[in-house]
């Protein structure tokens, strides 16, 4: 049984479906909408997307489990994904993971006691030329050191910016394209 999402989420998915000749093409953005509203994708969210798109839930689940940008369990308000593949590993990704573990007192896949942070190690995020890097919610932070990551996290804790894709995409469209995303928050 699918969970009930807001009327706004329903309308957004209906609008998305109109943008594609085949509604199945809207699976990924529909998953984002469900995740933005619920915080993660549980089985009810998968069912909700499947019902809206008109396909079997297993096909939606295949997409949701393939990509690391979809959270299959609850995460912190700010979810850090540390790239661990070759370029990032050679440039210091392990140190970033260790630093997060020590700073937050959690292991990958856990949520901090205050609910503010979680982190995980993921496969390539596609920013090999600026390794090591992390993605916090939907924003890339590149050429990181543990000290630079601390600066970013401290600023996030102070300013509590909205780092969801829908809001950062809108802001990037307002003349900010080309600036480092870490300067935008």
Whereabouts are the PLM-identified features?
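Signature of N-terminal electron-transfer/Fe-S-associated modules in redox systems
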Residues: 1-185
